[in-house]
């Protein structure tokens, strides 16, 4: 904290540091399609979202049965980067896998 002196009353006043609000968070949601193999979805969840085998399989099954599954919650820039990485990786391997971000 910084201090300033009020010369009229000889009182030291401390100013609190400015606090910034946390960034808005977004969930990255993987969408189901009829063409991407389940094993590929598990690999994507492990590679880009740091999921272990068990969590990746659980999310993949949620995507398969419910049509969508949350991969993680991130600040906007991180979420957008992960989505772009997944899209590029899937496209390069001839898979139509898609994910989107939604505000939390």
Curated annotation (Swiss-Prot):
InterPro entries, sorted: ClpS, ClpS_core, Ribosomal_bL12_C/ClpS-like
Gene3D superfamilies reported in the protein's UniProt record: 3.30.1390.10
Pfam families listed in its UniProt record: ClpS
One GO-annotated biological process of the protein: protein catabolic process
Known function: Involved in the modulation of the specificity of the ClpAP-mediated ATP-dependent protein degradation.
Homology family: Belongs to the ClpS family.
Subunit structure comment from the entry: Binds to the N-terminal domain of the chaperone ClpA.
Protein name: ATP-dependent Clp protease adapter protein ClpS
Gene: clpS
């Amino acid at each position: 904290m910084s201090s300033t002196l009020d010369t009229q009353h000889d009182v030291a006043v401390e100013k609190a540091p400015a606090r910034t609000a946390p960034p808005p968070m977004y969930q990255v949601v993987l969408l189901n399609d009829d063409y991407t193999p389940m094993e590929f979805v598990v690999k994507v969840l492990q590679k880009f979202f740091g999921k272990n085998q068990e969590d990746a399989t659980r999310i993949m099954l949620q995507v398969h049965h419910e049509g969508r599954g949350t991969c993680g919650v991130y600040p906007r820039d991180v979420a957008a980067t992960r989505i772009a990485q997944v899209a590029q990786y899937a496209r390069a391997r001839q898979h139509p896998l898609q994910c989107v971000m939604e505000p939390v």
